[in-house]
Amino acid sequence: MAQQRRGGFKRRKKFDYIAANKIEYVDYKDTELLSRFVSERGKILPRRVTGTSAKNQRKVTTAIKRARVMALMPYVNED
């Protein structure tokens, strides 16, 4: 039997931001887009958090790693 949640909290539906905006190529120079997929500490967020598809997650990960090598994005954000 399924139990109902208490408190009425409804979880937000995750969607693939890249597919929804019809972005074909994830550019490593577009740091504004890539910063959506990085935590405040600088770690790449997993698919279960961002809601991206596996294919687009690979594109994002590759672009973030390229941006880090080119010094466009930091490896670690320290406060």
From Swiss-Prot:
Pfam families, sorted: Ribosomal_S18
InterPro entries named in the record: Ribosomal_bS18, Ribosomal_bS18_CS, Ribosomal_bS18_sf
Q: Which molecular function terms from Gene Ontology are attached?
A: small ribosomal subunit rRNA binding; structural constituent of ribosome
Q: GO CC: one term?
A: cytosolic small ribosomal subunit
| UniProt entry tagged with the keyword Ribosomal protein | yes
Q: At the top level of its lineage, which domain of life is listed?
A: Bacteria
**Swiss-Prot/TrEMBL keywords:** Ribonucleoprotein, Ribosomal protein, RNA-binding, rRNA-binding
- Keyword Cytoplasm found: no
Any GO BP: translation
Describe the family membership recorded for this protein in Swiss-Prot or TrEMBL: Belongs to the bacterial ribosomal protein bS18 family.
| NCBIfam families with a match to the protein in the record | S18 (TIGR00165)
Q: What does this protein do?
A: Binds as a heterodimer with protein bS6 to the central domain of the 16S rRNA, where it helps stabilize the platform of the 30S subunit.
Q: What is its quaternary makeup?
A: Part of the 30S ribosomal subunit. Forms a tight heterodimer with protein bS6.
Q: What is this protein called?
A: Small ribosomal subunit protein bS18
Per the UniProt record, the source organism is: Streptococcus thermophilus (strain ATCC BAA-250 / LMG 18311)
Q: Which gene encodes it?
A: rpsR
